[in-house]
């Protein structure tokens, strides 16, 4: 009888489910719906779990955070912020606490509050898997610094990305951004020419030469700019937007120079790609 008078024991006794693995199974279902793009379905599932396991504050907080993510993906930012404001962070277990930081960062980035997002990304980053999301979070941090014009911090963060053995695409974009952050055009071109020699970037040569061309163009050096644009067009292995951009930029320069014979085929090929 003494046990029944204990409030914690009474709450435990009144719960509907005594197997905590069932809650995990439900959460996995909600996550699966989210990752399949069924955001409303996942919101419904997480709301059900939160009601069913109202006695478990960690489960409730987890569900609320996934609801925030789903609302944010649908662009329902007011609803997302409303739910986020109700999350009791102290109720999250140590294992799930980083989820609050990553969800907060995601919402702040989606609502273009980049500076506010930085501390949350920095908190979430060390808790991500080294071979999973950590390189991606490090890359996002670098982008946020770059968006806030913190060039040195951005360059340092991008260099950290390169040490994390990221995907080929992320490696390429990080190197490209490092080059673009160089204050000296000569140093930027030197870094970009190093990228040309890396075999793993052979399918992105159009982007690299295009960026070199842009550096020269910013210096009003149209001769070297066109030389690199033409090289990028010749080396392109994919009929994608990168090649189309170079063709249009080269076409614009030729047009301004009244070299219509060279401008016309550039525009024509770009139109076929787009």
Task: Please name every model-derived segment.
Residues 1-274:
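Acidic, polar-rich low-complexity tracts and alpha-helical solenoid repeat scaffolds
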């Amino acid at each position: 009888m003494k046990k029944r008078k204990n409030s914690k024991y009474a709450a435990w006794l009144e719960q509907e489910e005594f197997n905590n693995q069932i809650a995990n199974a439900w959460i996995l279902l909600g996550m699966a719906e989210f990752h399949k793009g069924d955001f409303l379905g996942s919101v419904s599932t997480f709301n059900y779990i939160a009601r069913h396991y109202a006695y478990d504050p960690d489960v409730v907080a987890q569900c609320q955070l996934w609801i925030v993510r789903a609302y944010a993906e649908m662009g329902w930012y007011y609803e997302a912020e409303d739910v986020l404001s109700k999350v009791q962070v102290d109720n999250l277990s140590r294992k799930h606490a980083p989820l609050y930081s990553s969800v907060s960062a995601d919402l702040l980035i989606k609502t273009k509050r980049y500076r506010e997002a930085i501390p949350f990304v920095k908190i979430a980053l060390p808790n991500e898997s080294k071979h999973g999301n950590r390189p991606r979070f490090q890359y996002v941090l670098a982008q946020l610094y770059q968006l806030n014009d913190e060039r040195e911090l951005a360059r340092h963060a991008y260099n950290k990305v390169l040490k994390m053995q990221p995907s080929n695409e992320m490696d390429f974009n990080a190197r490209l951004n490092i080059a673009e952050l160089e204050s000296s055009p000569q140093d930027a071109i030197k870094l970009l020419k190093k990228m040309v020699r890396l075999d793993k970037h052979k399918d992105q040569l159009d982007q690299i030469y295009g960026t070199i061309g842009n550096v020269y163009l910013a210096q009003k050096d149209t001769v070297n700019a066109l030389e690199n644009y033409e090289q990028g067009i010749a080396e392109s292995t994919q009929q994608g937007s990168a090649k189309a951009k170079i063709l249009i930029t080269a076409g614009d320069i030729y047009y301004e120079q009244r070299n219509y014979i060279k401008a016309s085929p550039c525009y024509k090929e770009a139109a076929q790609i787009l």
